[in-house]
């Protein structure tokens, strides 16, 4: 089989990753999922676009296909339809937990190289949301860059930049006004040819304006943002990959714009987002310390003496509690093990918030 050498490589295909895939020798062709529309998907192969439907075996397996997937397809001669025979291994995979109290998680997107976290420096500004997004990126395996937008609407952009910098650690940060095309184009320095980027951010953060600037036209419609509260809606409902004129692949996926994203992860990954807590935890008396009411807790001591800010501490406890709740929902044994610790965490968090309110 001849290897793709132009179209698919522009969409990020790396032949070396899949050379060992035996099905490539069975008359199948690689392609990438550009968009998913219910029972079929739009797939790009070296010869152009196809409409993909699942094979019977793949449908029976229960696997779901998402925008960004690399797949192996079997063409139907003389037809725009093709049969998706296999979903290739994902190098990164973005999920969120199912709504409500349902078990499991929803696949959102795959094979993302870079997550751009977009946050407005107006009423959209929230350091705590940045922490949540950094954790989501850590779990997905993708790299992340933070883009602080609307600096022209902020009275103290430098102070907010420094506040986010203390949270972000080594994560790159750009501060722009998306209405200034020159400033928006600075984002391109983070996007290599063939690499896939996508966005995280709440409605009204300026994602649509940035997307249109990067794509060189009004691909995504935008609604006005209310002056009173800074809110707005990104009106796209499609999930699709676009080639950037400068190289790279842009994914606009409405399923990953929400603030409440949360899914699989580990306590170790959470501590990577809160490194000061990980350091202080080394001083804890107990290895399974929940950093609440246990005696000789290094984290609580660090909060009391100012080495860890209360805001960061409460944010960590909140995310840790969510993580435990997700794990317990999906693992009955884990639920039994975590039940007592969860009660202690809730009680301690309420007490600390109450004590803080009295000061």
UniProtKB/Swiss-Prot annotation:
InterPro entries: G_CP_dom (IPR030378), P-loop_NTPase (IPR027417), Ribosome_biogen_GTPase_RsgA (IPR004881), RsgA_GTPase_dom (IPR010914). Residues 349-359 have a biased composition (Basic residues). Its EC number is 3.6.1.-. One of its GO terms (cellular component) is cytoplasm. GO terms for biological process: ribosomal small subunit biogenesis. It is an enzyme of class 3 (hydrolase). GO terms for molecular function: GTP binding; GTPase activity; metal ion binding; rRNA binding. Zn(2+) binds at residues 284, 289, 291, 297. GTP binds at residues 149-152, 201-209. Its main location: cytoplasm. Keywords: Cytoplasm, GTP-binding, Hydrolase, Metal-binding, Nucleotide-binding, Ribosome biogenesis, RNA-binding, rRNA-binding, Zinc. Residues 101-259 form the CP-type G domain. It is found in: Cytoplasm. Signal peptide: none annotated. Binds 1 zinc ion per subunit. Its cofactor is Zn(2+). The keyword Membrane does not apply. The keyword Cytoplasm applies. Residues 331-359 are annotated as: Disordered. It comes from the Bacteria. One of several proteins that assist in the late maturation steps of the functional core of the 30S ribosomal subunit. Helps release RbfA from mature subunits. May play a role in the assembly of ribosomal proteins into the subunit. Circularly permuted GTPase that catalyzes slow GTP hydrolysis, GTPase activity is stimulated by the 30S ribosomal subunit. Belongs to the TRAFAC class YlqF/YawG GTPase family. RsgA subfamily. Monomer. Associates with 30S ribosomal subunit, binds 16S rRNA. This is Small ribosomal subunit biogenesis GTPase RsgA. It comes from Leptospira interrogans serogroup Icterohaemorrhagiae serovar Lai (strain 56601).
């Amino acid at each position: 089989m001849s290897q793709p050498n132009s179209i698919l490589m522009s969409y990020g295909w790396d032949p070396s990753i899949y050379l060992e895939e035996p099905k490539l020798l069975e008359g199948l062709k690689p392609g990438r999922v550009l968009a998913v529309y219910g029972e079929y998907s739009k797939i790009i192969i070296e010869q152009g676009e196809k409409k993909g439907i699942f094979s019977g075996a793949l449908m029976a397996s229960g696997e779901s296909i998402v925008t960004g997937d690399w797949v192996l397809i079997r063409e139907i001669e003389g037809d725009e339809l093709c049969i998706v025979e296999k979903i290739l291994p994902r190098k990164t995979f973005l999920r969120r937990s199912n709504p409500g109290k349902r078990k499991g998680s929803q696949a959102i997107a795959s094979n993302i190289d870079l997550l751009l976290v977009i946050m407005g420096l107006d009423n959209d500004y929230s350091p705590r949301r940045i922490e949540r997004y950094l954790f989501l990126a850590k779990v997905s395996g993708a790299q992340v860059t933070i883009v602080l937008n609307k600096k022209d609407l902020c009275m103290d952009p430098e102070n907010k930049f420094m506040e986010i910098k203390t949270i972000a650690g080594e994560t790159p940060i750009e501060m722009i006004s998306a209405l200034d095309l020159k400033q928006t184009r600075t984002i391109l320095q983070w996007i290599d040819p063939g690499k896939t980027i996508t966005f995280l951010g709440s409605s009204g953060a300026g994602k649509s304006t940035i997307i249109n600037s990067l794509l060189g036209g009004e691909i995504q419609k935008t609604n006005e943002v209310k002056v009173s509260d800074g809110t707005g809606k990104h009106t796209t409902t499609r999930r699709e990959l676009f080639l950037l004129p400068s190289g790279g692949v842009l994914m606009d996926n409405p399923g990953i714009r929400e603030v409440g994203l949360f899914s699989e992860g580990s306590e170790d990954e959470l501590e990577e987002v809160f490194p000061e807590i990980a350091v202080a935890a080394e001083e804890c008396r107990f290895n399974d310390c929940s950093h609440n009411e246990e005696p000789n807790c290094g984290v609580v001591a660090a909060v009391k003496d100012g080495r860890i800010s209360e805001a960061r501490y409460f944010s960590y406890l909140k995310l840790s509690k969510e993580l435990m709740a997700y794990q317990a929902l999906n693992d009955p044994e884990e639920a039994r093990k975590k039940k007592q610790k969860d009660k202690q965490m809730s009680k301690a968090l309420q007490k600390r918030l109450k004590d803080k309110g009295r000061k």
